Amino acid sequence: MDKIKYRPIGMKAIRLLERRQYTFDVDVKATKTEVKRWIEGFFSVKVVGMNSHRPPKKKKRMGSVIGYPVRYKRMIVTLKVGDSIPLS
């Protein structure tokens, strides 16, 4: 449960809600099986499909030092027809 960081709310995530697909940002070491078990247990829904990807790195500048923010993995979860996850 501590591996799921947050749910991004952007234009693509909102567009995916129409197709019963929910977006989660998770720890890089989290697997699809772990995330599926957690979502099915916590929200009492049935997951029928999962896709994952790692968004590209972006540079951050702090004064004269250039670095990269902490990496994460994005999971797109598809639910069974009739199931939904509350947005709040």
From Swiss-Prot:
Entry keywords, A to Z: Chloroplast, Plastid, Ribonucleoprotein, Ribosomal protein, RNA-binding, rRNA-binding
GO molecular function annotation: rRNA binding; structural constituent of ribosome
Free-text function comment from the UniProt entry: Binds to 23S rRNA.
Subunit comment: Part of the 50S ribosomal subunit.
Subcellular location: Plastid, Chloroplast
Organism of origin: Spirogyra maxima (Green alga)
UniProt main location, coarse: plastid
GO BP terms, alphabetized: translation
Regions annotated as coiled coil: none
Origin superkingdom: Eukaryota
Keyword rRNA-binding among UniProt keywords: yes
InterPro entries registered for this protein in UniProt: Nucleotide-bd_a/b_plait_sf, Ribosomal_uL23-like, Ribosomal_uL23/eL15/eS24_sf
SUPFAM superfamilies cross-referenced by the UniProt entry: Ribosomal proteins S24e, L23 and L15e
GO cellular component, one term: chloroplast
Family of the protein in this entry: Belongs to the universal ribosomal protein uL23 family.
Protein name: Large ribosomal subunit protein uL23c
